[in-house]
């Protein structure tokens, strides 16, 4: 089940010290019981990058969300317009993409692709409650991070080849220096 899969993810993060403090894992509840969403102000969908699966999940959880609840996707590749096709009309003004940079416990940036009242509400939550930096993005392929990141990595590989630098050395030299935690 999805809840069991999510729990395995929590267990893996505990082993890898993925939480700032181990007790933070107690705040994560892995479950298939969508009724647990009824009183939530913000629900973040973070399942695999399959548009049909995301649409199915939105349809399944919609009856449990309050009218005011914000819903966002942590996608890093799917366009907002495509995701909105699976979101009920009444929820669309409360929907956005909130792409958290990985690993989120270290990286402060969150790409925000939204419209209407959702953008202001999520920006406030991201910045004031989570202590992160919200980057407003247009609904373009790869948003900002993947577009720049892919170019940056490709340029790094090209320069490493050009100057006969091993990939391991290039990675060690630039990873942490540019804020890449691993």
Region spans (language model):
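Rossmann-like dinucleotide-binding core of oxidoreductases
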Residues: 147, 154-172, 178
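A short structural micro-motif
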Residues: 29-31, 176-180
């Amino acid at each position: 089940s999805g809840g069991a899969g999510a729990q395995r993810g929590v267990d893996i993060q505990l082993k890898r010290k993925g939480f700032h403090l181990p007790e933070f894992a107690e705040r994560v509840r892995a479950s298939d019981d969508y009724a647990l969403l009824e009183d939530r102000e913000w629900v973040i969908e973070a399942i695999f990058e399959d548009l049909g699966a995301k649409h199915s999940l939105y349809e399944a959880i919609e009856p449990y969300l309050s009218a005011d609840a914000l819903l966002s996707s942590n996608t890093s590749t799917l366009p907002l317009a495509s995701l909105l096709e699976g979101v009920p009309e009444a929820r669309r003004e409360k929907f956005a993409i909130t792409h958290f940079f990985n690993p989120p416990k270290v990286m402060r940036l969150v790409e925000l692709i939204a419209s209407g009242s959702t953008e202001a509400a999520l920006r406030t939550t991201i910045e004031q409650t989570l202590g992160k930096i919200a980057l407003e993005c247009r609904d373009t392929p790869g948003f900002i991070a993947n577009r720049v990141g892919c170019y940056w990595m490709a340029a790094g590989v090209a320069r490493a080849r050009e100057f006969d630098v091993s990939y391991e050395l290039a990675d060690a030299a630039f990873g942490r220096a540019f804020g890449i935690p691993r």
